[in-house]
Amino acid sequence: MKRSTTDSDLAGDAHNETNKKMKSTEEEEIGFSNLDENLVYEVLKHVDAKTLAMSSCVSKIWHKTAQDERLWELICTRHWTNIGCGQNQLRSVVLALGGFRRLHSLYLWPLSKPNPRARFGKDELKLTLSLLSIRYYEKMSFTKRPLPESK
């Protein structure tokens, strides 16, 4: 004997259908953040410090990978050609002092920020305009002008 369909059964089927769609969408979204740690490491070793720091917010695996001292060492030493000591010696000193991530966040990152534009006060502005007008006045040639006649 077949069971008769009721309105609640139809509503339940529609609800199940939307749940299936949501689950499949979630699975698609989760796929990118579940990359292999080695693959994530290979990608992250080519990014800048800001991108590396932001990537740690993607997932737990990405966070763990972004905390890797080897990645921060690459970022810190990327632009240093010759620092006067060997790579292993540098690594041992920096790791003893807290690591490359700490070195970057406390010392290198503040230096890499552009300085804010200097704002002139009234005195500086007046002095600059005065010097400009003096230079302009000196460059004027008065020899070509006739002198005013005195009466």
UniProtKB/Swiss-Prot annotation:
Keyword match Ligase: no
Protein name stated in the entry: F-box protein GID2
Keyword Nucleus among record annotations: yes
Keywords: Gibberellin signaling pathway, Nucleus, Ubl conjugation pathway
One CC-aspect GO term: SCF ubiquitin ligase complex
Domain F-box: 29-75
Pathway assigned to this chain's UniProt record: Protein modification; protein ubiquitination
Record field: compositional bias (Basic and acidic residues): 1-25
Location (main, coarse): nucleus
Protein's job: Essential component of the SCF-type E3 ligase complex, SCF(GID2), a complex that positively regulates the gibberellin signaling pathway. Upon gibberellin treatment, the SCF(GID2) complex mediates the ubiquitination and subsequent degradation of DELLA proteins (GAI, RGA and RGL2), some repressors of the gibberellin pathway, leading to activate the pathway.
Tissue occurrence: Expressed in all tissues tested, including rosette leaves, green siliques, flowers, stems, cauline leaves and seedlings.
GO terms under biological process: gibberellic acid mediated signaling pathway; protein ubiquitination; regulation of gibberellic acid mediated signaling pathway; seed dormancy process; seed germination
Phylogenetic placement of the source organism: Eukaryota, Viridiplantae, Streptophyta, Embryophyta, Tracheophyta
Subunit details: Part of some SCF(GID2) complex, which consist of SKP1B, CUL1 cullin, GID2/SLY1 and some RING box protein. Interacts directly with SKP1A and SKP1B. Interacts directly with DELLA proteins GAI, RGA, RGL1, RGL3 and probably RGL2. May have a higher affinity for phosphorylated DELLA proteins.
Subcellular localization(s) per the UniProt record: Nucleus
Renumbered residue ranges of the record's region Disordered: 1-27
